[in-house]
Design a protein with these regions (language model features):
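Juxtamembrane membrane-water interface segments that cap and precede transmembrane helices
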Residues: 40-55, 204-225, 238-242
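Transmembrane-helix motifs of polytopic, lipid-linked glycan transferases
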Residues: 67-83
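Transmembrane-helix signature of polytopic, membrane-embedded enzymes
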Residues: 80-99, 117
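Aromatic- and kink-enriched transmembrane "portal" helix at the membrane-lumen/periplasm boundary
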Residues: 95-113
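Membrane-interface transmembrane helices that cradle and orient dolichyl/undecaprenyl
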Residues: 122-137
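Membrane-interface alpha helices of multi-pass inner-membrane proteins
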Residues: 138-152
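Perimembrane helix-loop-helix junctions
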Residues: 159-183
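Membrane-water interface signatures at transmembrane helix termini and the short loops
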Residues: 244-301
Length: 320
């Protein structure tokens, strides 16, 4: 089965499209991120604007969301293929993304789709910046996109730590470049501050809502916990299994996976701050987990183990 995805086979695209539709049949009935109590007004307004995409509106909205998710998977696939972050990538990165998306709670929600495309874009710009002598414009855009995500929730300010560490890893950053990254990060908050001030609605809570810390475990069934655990366990197993092969690749590739691991750990920290709402924000892990999980499929001489994992993930997505 994985052989099909290792080559640019038209049949692989059909199978990927089928994987993208799996969330339509999910029996999940858990609160989504849009129902979290500590979202910022910016995020609430954005979700209201995209309310037509909410899967509760019917099959049309659900299928359109599936198309967007399928497009995101191909976007991530192109990033990894273009920059040769995998040997013979084929459609494996897209497969990794869609398999993990299928076991992610509320995968069709606009909140997950928005965050995913922004994180993929930031990752692409990070990789591109490696070979740029002067990447001032790229750094500002990275900072702006990171700041935009951070404006969704106060705890997402931790994204700035990842952006700073990632740039430090990817290139010999100077104080000027770090300042440009920081300026880009602050810009969304500046525009928000200016808009609220001009409309006489300026309040600190409107920009930085209080973080509702809740470290109690959510009440989920065993099957749902196993599915969510795959977002944590499978990427880690993949990095352990593929570590030797990745260690022999060029420096840009090794650094790209390193910043992905840092993002993965950063997202886990954010989820820990909202432990009771882990299932609401699990979508944060999708992009870094998919990038880390992709090398798993090329780490075995025989394909029966990767094929078994694919089958088990599809079953887990359908029977929850």
């Amino acid at each position: 089965m994985t052989y099909l995805f290792k080559h640019n086979n038209p049949l692989a695209l059909i199978l990927l499209a089928a994987l993208a539709v799996i969330p339509v049949f999910q029996p999940w009935s858990l609160p989504s991120l849009s129902q979290a109590q500590d979202n910022s007004p910016v995020f609430e307004k954005l979700l209201y604007f995209l309310s037509w995409l909410n899967p509760s509106n019917g099959i049309t909205s659900q299928l359109f969301a599936c198309v967007l998710i399928f497009t995101e998977s191909l976007f991530l696939n192109k990033v990894i293929s273009d920059h040769k972050l995998m040997e013979k990538a084929g459609y494996i990165p897209a497969l990794s993304f869609l398999l993990l998306n299928a076991i992610t709670p509320n995968a069709l929600m606009p909140s997950n789709i928005i965050i995913n495309v922004i994180l993929i874009s930031i990752f692409k710009l990070m990789v591109v910046s490696y070979k740029q002598n002067r990447s001032y414009n790229i750094l500002i855009v990275i900072g702006f996109l990171s700041g935009f995500v951070a404006s969704f929730n106060t705890s997402y300010l931790l994204i700035y730590i990842w952006a700073s560490l990632a740039i430090l890893i990817m290139r010999p950053i100077s104080l000027r470049e770090w300042a440009l990254l920081t300026v880009g990060f602050i810009m969304p908050f500046y525009f928000l501050f200016a808009g609220l001030y001009l409309t006489d609605q300026l309040k600190f809570q409107s920009i930085f809502p209080a973080i509702i810390l809740n470290f109690s475990m959510p009440q989920l069934s065993l099957l749902k916990w196993i599915s969510l655990g795959c977002l944590l366990i499978l990427p880690l197993l993949s990095m352990i299994k593929a570590g030797d092969k990745l260690g022999k690749m060029v420096l840009q590739v090794r650094k790209s996976y390193l910043i992905t691991i840092v993002l993965w750990l950063n997202c886990i920290l954010i989820l820990f701050l909202h432990l009771n709402g882990f299932h609401q924000r699990a979508g944060l892990l999708l992009v870094p987990s998919a990038i880390m999980f992709a090398p798993f499929f090329g780490s075995f001489k025989r394909e029966y183990i990767p094929n078994l994992i694919i089958i088990l993930l599809i079953i887990a997505a359908l029977i929850r």
